[in-house]
Curated annotation (Swiss-Prot):
One of its GO terms (molecular function) is lyase activity. GO terms for biological process: L-histidine biosynthetic process. This is Imidazole glycerol phosphate synthase subunit HisF. It catalyses: 5-[(5-phospho-1-deoxy-D-ribulos-1-ylimino)methylamino]-1-(5-phospho-beta-D-ribosyl)imidazole-4-carboxamide + L-glutamine = D-erythro-1-(imidazol-4-yl)glycerol 3-phosphate + 5-amino-1-(5-phospho-beta-D-ribosyl)imidazole-4-carboxamide + L-glutamate + H(+). Its EC number is 4.3.2.10. The keyword DNA-binding does not apply.
Length: 252
């Protein structure tokens, strides 16, 4: 059985880690390279950087962050945000990232998933989906940092992304993001059952128990969190030890 992964997420804006609640109200959480090294030392399985800078300057800063992070950590890391072409992917991977995360750009031009997978391999392509509930057992895909409704069904889009060559799905429940009341279990379970690639659950982690719930009931392959790690509300080690006591296979 494959070990379940615990993944801290770092939202980076103009070279600083920030964390908001339901995609708004950002507050500063620290230096991305320092935080990445801390999580690598604490035995996180992977890291995800999401560049939420709006400006070209901010994007250039991100390449610098990736290069410094790559030199300082020993675990794989994914970078997403503002990646719109194979050239963008090349720039990020050359700077030291292991995987690319595509969100809005993939919804606007799904062929980008295939292009990236063809050049770099499916294992490098993570498709991030921001999902909001629109009724019983129905979720809609949102883009542009959770601002724009697309009318697209989340489960169908996850299946399409897999067919185009995505190697992984990063699934954020917008309804639960930042609330710390638990992951979107039904959403995660439905998507996990609908695709044959790993699903990383995101949005809602507040307690160690929430990780257990989403990795078992939600059938996720990995669970991601931000603020509870950034602000030392719990640690990677504490989450992993708890999961081990509950019989969940994790890397030590």
């Amino acid at each position: 059985m494959l070990a379940k992964r615990i993944i801290p997420c770092l939202d980076v804006k103009d070279g600083r880690v920030v964390k908001g609640m339901q995609f708004v109200g950002l507050r500063d959480a620290g230096d991305p390279v320092e935080l990445a090294k801390k999580y690598s030392d604490e035995r996180a399985d992977e890291l995800i950087f999401l560049d939420i800078s709006a400006s070209h300057e901010g994007r250039k800063t991100m390449v610098d962050v990736i290069e410094k992070t790559s030199a300082n950590i020993t675990i794989p890391f994914t970078v997403g945000g503002g990646i719109n072409s194979v050239d963008d992917m090349k720039r990020i991977l050359r700077a030291g990232a292991d995987k690319i995360s595509l969100n809005t750009a993939a919804v606007l031009r799904p062929e980008l998933i295939r292009e990236g997978a063809t050049v770099f391999g499916s294992q490098c392509i993570v498709v991030a989906i921001d999902a909001r509930s629109v009724g019983e057992d129905r979720w809609e895909v949102y883009t542009h940092g959770g601002r724009n409704a697309t009318g697209r069904d989340v489960i169908r889009w996850a299946q399409e992304a897999e067919a185009l060559g995505a190697g992984e799905i990063l699934l954020t429940s917008m309804d639960d993001d930042g609330e710390k009341k638990g992951f979107g279990l039904e959403l995660t379970k439905r998507v996990s059952e609908a695709v044959g690639i790993p699903v990383i659950a995101s949005g809602g982690a507040g307690l160690r128990e929430h990780f257990y719930d989403v990795l078992t009931q939600g059938k996720a392959d990995a669970a991601l969190a931000a603020s509870i790690f950034h602000y030392d509300e719990t640690s990677i080690q504490s989450v992993k030890e708890y999961l081990q006591t509950k019989g969940v296979v994790v890397r030590p």
